[in-house]
């Protein structure tokens, strides 16, 4: 049995989200939440909220035991990129790419 949670279009670059996601892959849920709580990265609170959502899904929808849950899959994929322009010298402009991510977590029981 597995429980899943997905956050889409979150405003953080996938490369930066991937650093946080790699820290908790394969860990037990309570250990992963402790790691995320003290990780000083912008993606950490987003991933922490996502893991808590997956735990709630496991408990309420599937009736799984919280103490036996671990993160079997977690990944951050690229979402759509918002393109903006920043004015530069001499009437020019450069493109600023505001990247978004889709982060997905799958929990299983041991």
From Swiss-Prot:
Q: Which Gene3D superfamilies match?
A: Ribosomal protein L22/L17 (3.90.470.10)
Any one of the GO CC terms: cytosolic large ribosomal subunit
Q: Which domain of life is it from?
A: Bacteria
The entry lists its GO molecular-function terms as: rRNA binding; structural constituent of ribosome
Q: Check the record and name the InterPro entries matching this protein.
A: Ribosomal_uL22, Ribosomal_uL22_bac/chlpt-type, Ribosomal_uL22_bac/org-type, Ribosomal_uL22_CS, Ribosomal_uL22_sf
> What is any Pfam family matched here?
Ribosomal_L22
* SUPFAM superfamilies per UniProt: Ribosomal protein L22
Family per UniProt?
Belongs to the universal ribosomal protein uL22 family.
Function description: This protein binds specifically to 23S rRNA; its binding is stimulated by other ribosomal proteins, e.g. L4, L17, and L20. It is important during the early stages of 50S assembly. It makes multiple contacts with different domains of the 23S rRNA in the assembled 50S subunit and ribosome.
What's the subunit arrangement here? Part of the 50S ribosomal subunit.
UniProt protein name: Large ribosomal subunit protein uL22
Source taxonomy: Bacteria, Bacillati, Bacillota, Clostridia, Peptostreptococcales
């Amino acid at each position: 049995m597995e429980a899943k949670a997905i956050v889409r279009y979150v405003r953080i670059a996938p490369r930066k989200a991937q650093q946080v996601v790699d820290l908790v892959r394969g860990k037990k849920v309570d250990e992963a939440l402790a790691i995320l709580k003290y990780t000083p990265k912008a993606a950490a609170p987003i991933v922490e909220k996502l893991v808590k959502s997956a735990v709630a899904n496991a408990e309420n929808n599937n009736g799984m035991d919280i103490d036996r849950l671990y993160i079997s899959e977690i990944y951050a994929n690229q979402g759509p990129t918002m393109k903006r322009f920043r004015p530069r010298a001499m009437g020019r402009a450069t493109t600023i790419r505001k990247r978004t991510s889709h982060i997905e977590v799958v929990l299983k029981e041991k």
